Curated annotation (Swiss-Prot):
InterPro entries from the UniProt entry: Class_I_gatase-like, CobQ/CobB/MinD/ParA_Nub-bd_dom, CobQ_GATase1, CobQ_N, CobQ_synth, GATase_3, P-loop_NTPase
Residue ranges of domain GATase cobBQ-type in the record: 273-468
Matching PANTHER family: COBYRIC ACID SYNTHASE, DETHIOBIOTIN SYNTHETASE
Catalytic residues identified in the record: 354, 460
Record HAMAP family: CobQ
GO biological process assignments: cobalamin biosynthetic process
Pfam family, one: GATase_3
Full protein name: Cobyric acid synthase
Keywords: Cobalamin biosynthesis, Glutamine amidotransferase
GO molecular function: ABC-type vitamin B12 transporter activity; catalytic activity
Protein's job: Catalyzes amidations at positions B, D, E, and G on adenosylcobyrinic A,C-diamide. NH(2) groups are provided by glutamine, and one molecule of ATP is hydrogenolyzed for each amidation.
Gene that specifies this protein: cobQ
Pathway recorded for this protein: Cofactor biosynthesis; adenosylcobalamin biosynthesis
PROSITE patterns per record: GATASE_COBBQ (PS51274)
Species whose genome carries this gene: Polaromonas sp. (strain JS666 / ATCC BAA-500)
Length: 507
């Protein structure tokens, strides 16, 4: 540090899904490679994808951005995290911790309470770093939300950030999106926009002319990068499971032919072309932890929401959930409970992670009204009792002796994290009758059925551990560092010369 406040670069988008998160990640690594001390920042994130850091939870995007910046992830990098539980209800995480009072408060009433906390976190990062790379949210031109803005132009003006405005040209209307967003900003806000970025372009870039020049004549803002479509950049999209789909495995599933089997059981996890299905219920959480599977050669990963899509899969994953009982009810309404049970009955491998583990058991008991009582799927002889307290911690653990489909994980150590309400234990009556849940990790972190094809664990991040991927698939996948360097190389290649340096130049 030079002793002066950091320069700040901010990535704004014309819409959600424009490419803000990955571009912010790329900028973090680009500036870090120059020997600068870099930190990411996003004032408010709405996502059920979260990571555990010192002090609590932050959005997964900011966690990976910190790693790209070669910085220790910190709750100040995402001071406000909203985790949707229902269509009109979110759990509010402030500086890493659940804030029950804010969770009950109407959305428009929160900004006055949280802005001082956001500003303080940002000011501290500015004082401790050379560059802070800031990510906006949605669009900065939502005029109905402007009075309560705490994440876009209010942040940009607070720091005097050099702002890039990025748009997804693949969806069409890119120039209108850019001009319309710019036009709806105040004059002082427009002065902060230093460049437009056309993301996800396919085809001959010369065909864009004279669009960029005309846009610059109308706004005074140059188009500083045209980024070609890049499906395989290695990072998940933040805003939704089906936005991730084109980047996963070898493609997205299509509906099976009429009369196809709903399940087939028993193949090895090292089958030549394993097909892995993740059930995408409405309140799915931490979906990004499955992203590494798409880098495993030959693996076909698909997201499913109907029984027919489970035809021919080798194994089924029930991921985490922000509303376990509600998502379990949805799963039953779709008929997926019967399809998963049929797959398991035929010997097919089933994995439940966190909320997915809880669903696999016999019952979910909720004495405090957190998630609601519900019968489980009955594929693991365990019972989960929800608790008011929330377990949030990073863990190092090791699998014990596993049988059947998951035997390759025996003795494998892994690093992961817990984010859950509730504790899971064997069903006493079933154990007495000989139906035993086998604890395969210390402290009740993982359970397996006697047959050996159904496994449930509380630890998130299993597929991000190289030892697990090696054990299950015999595969070595690119390291995160290699992914981050690839992102930095990409923007260095496609931005106009000198632009990235000019963004952090002293005025």
């Amino acid at each position: 540090m030079s002793g002066t406040l950091a320069r700040s670069v901010m990535v704004l988008g014309t819409t959600s899904g424009a490419g803000k998160s990955w571009l912010t990640t790329a900028l973090c690594r680009y500036y870090a490679r120059q020997g600068l001390k870099v930190a990411p920042f996003k004032a408010q994130n709405m996502s059920n994808n979260a990571r555990v850091v010192a002090g609590g939870e932050i959005g997964s995007a900011q966690y990976f951005q910190a790693l790209a910046a070669r910085a220790e992830p910190d709750v100040r990098m995402n001071p406000l995290l909203l985790k949707p539980e229902k269509d009109t209800q979110s759990q509010v995480i402030l500086m890493g911790q659940v804030d029950a009072e804010l969770s009950r408060m109407p959305w428009r009433g929160r900004s006055a309470s949280v802005w001082p906390v956001i500003a303080r976190a940002l000011d501290e990062l500015l004082a401790e770093n050379d560059v802070v790379v800031i990510e906006g949210a949605g669009s900065p031109a939502e005029i109905n939300l402007k009075s309560s803005d705490i994440v876009n132009m209010r942040v940009a003006q607070h720091t005097g950030a050099s702002c890039l405005l990025v748009t997804d040209i693949d969806r069409g209307g890119a120039f209108a999106h850019l001009y319309g967003t710019w036009a709806m900003l105040d004059e002082a806000e427009r002065q902060l926009i230093k460049g437009f970025v056309l993301n996800k372009f396919r085809g001959d870039a010369s065909l864009l002319a004279p669009g960029p020049q005309m846009l610059q004549e109308m706004t005074g803002v140059p188009t500083v990068a045209t980024l070609p479509m890049w499906w395989q950049h290695g990072l998940p999209e933040e805003d939704g499971v089906f936005d991730m789909a084109p980047t996963l495995g070898t493609g997205v599933s299509t509906l099976p032919p009429e009369g196809a089997e709903l399940a087939r059981g028993g193949p090895s996890l090292r089958s030549p072309r394993p097909v892995i299905a993740v059930i995408a219920y409405p309140r799915i959480s931490n979906l990004d932890e499955f992203q590494p599977l798409k880098n495993v050669p030959g693996v076909h990963l698909k997201w499913v929401r109907s029984p027919g899509e489970l035809a021919g899969v080798d194994w089924i994953i029930l991921p985490g959930s922000k509303h376990t009982s509600g998502d379990l009810a949805w799963l039953r309404a779709q008929g997926l409970d019967r399809a998963v049970a049929a797959h398991a009955e035929q010997g097919g491998a089933v994995l439940g992670v966190c909320g997915g583990l809880q669903m696999l058991g016999e019952a979910l008991i909720d004495p405090h009204g957190i998630d609601g009582n519900a019968p489980g799927l009955g594929l693991l002889p365990v019972v989960t009792v929800f608790e008011e307290g929330k377990t949030v911690q990073r863990r190092q653990a090791r699998f014990g002796e596993l049988a059947g489909a998951w035997a390759a994980l025996s003795g494998v150590g892994l690093q992961g994290y817990e984010i859950h309400h509730g504790q899971t234990a064997p069903h006493t009556a079933m154990a007495a009758a000989g139906d035993i849940a086998h604890g395969v990790m210390a402290e009740g972190l993982a359970w397996q059925n006697t047959r050996g094809n159904v496994l449930g664990l509380y630890l998130h991040g299993m597929f991000e551990d190289p030892a697990v991927l090696q054990a299950l698939f015999g595969a070595t996948v690119p390291t995160l560092d290699a992914v981050f360097d690839g992102l930095a190389d990409y923007i260095e290649q496609h931005f106009e010369p000198g632009v990235l340096q000019s963004l952090i130049a002293t005025p």
